[in-house]
Structure formats: structure tokens, C-alpha cells
């Protein structure tokens, strides 16, 4: 089922701790920005992922693809765009872009699984069971 809606974005600054010895953003640092984009997208739709976690429903990233186009640098202001693409039975797929002005820094596709901590288990023990994406999330994302 395709999710409708426009791309949502947050604006972030690139800090020194994001960069590597070459003065550009270290590739793994982008993961933090992508996560913040997805989390804030959900929050903008009235969905608090942390509240779901308290009830035992988690949304781990199970797939991530990134195409790097051009580097961001210390001091840059970047926008992290997030758009829901598909809601499966037990998964959510997002397309994301990080841009600096008109320049595309990267394009990404991320898949979250929707899982519940099994009775007596914990996330640390990885006793996780796939569950259907809650109806509230389906409605608020627009699918």
C-alpha cells in the first residue's frame, strides 16, 4: 500500500564531530541525520515512537540503502527530507534525501520492521516478533 503525503524536512547543522580527517562528513554520521529525519517525521504526524517502545512495540531499521552524491562539510546547513513510500503488513518504507541548498548530498531508502518484544523478553535479548503496523500509524501517515 503506497503512503501519500509530501516530503517532510528538518534542518540540521553539520558539526565538527560529524566530519572525518578529510574535512567532510564521515559517511556513518549521515545515519544520525537520517534517523532524526524519520523520528521527527513521525512526531510531526502525532506519532511518538518512544511511547510505542514503552508498550513493547519497536521499529528497528532492517534495511538501508544510501547513494552518496557529494559531501557535506563542517558548518553546512542541511535539510533532511523524509517521505513514507510504503506501509507493509509489518514494515514501513521511507525515501529520504539530504540536501544543502539545491545540492543533493545523498539519497536513501530505509525500511523499519514493526516488532513486539515477546513476553518475558527484552530488546537486548532480541526476542522480537513481527506484528502488524498499528492502525493509528497507518492513518496518520496517510496510507
Where are each of the predicted segments found?
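Hot-dog-fold acyl-thioester-processing enzymes
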Residues: 2-61, 117-143
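Hydrophobic beta-strand-centered segment that forms part of the acyl-chain substrate-binding groove
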Residues: 41-92, 107, 112-113
Amino acid at each position: 500500500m503506497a503512503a501519500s503525503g509530501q516530503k517532510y524536512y528538518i534542518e540540521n547543522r553539520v558539526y565538527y564531530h560529524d566530519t572525518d580527517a578529510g574535512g567532510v562528513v564521515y559517511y556513518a554520521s549521515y545515519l544520525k541525520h537520517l534517523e532524526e529525519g524519520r523520528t521527527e517525521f513521525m512526531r510531526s504526524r502525532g506519532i511518538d515512537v518512544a511511547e510505542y517502545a514503552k508498550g513493547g512495540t519497536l521499529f528497528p531499521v532492517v534495511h538501508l540503502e544510501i547513494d552518496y552524491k557529494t559531501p557535506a562539510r563542517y558548518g553546512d546547513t542541511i535539510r533532511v527530507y523524509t517521505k513514507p513510500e510504503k506501509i507493509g503488513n509489518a514494515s514501513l518504507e521511507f525515501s529520504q534525501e539530504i540536501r544543502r541548498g539545491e545540492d543533493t548530498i545523498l539519497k536513501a531508502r530505509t525500511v523499519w520492521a514493526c516488532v513486539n518484544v515477546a513476553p518475558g523478553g527484552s530488546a537486548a535479548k532480541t526476542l522480537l516478533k513481527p506484528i502488524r503496523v498499528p492502525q493509528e500509524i497507518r492513518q496518520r501517515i496517510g496510507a
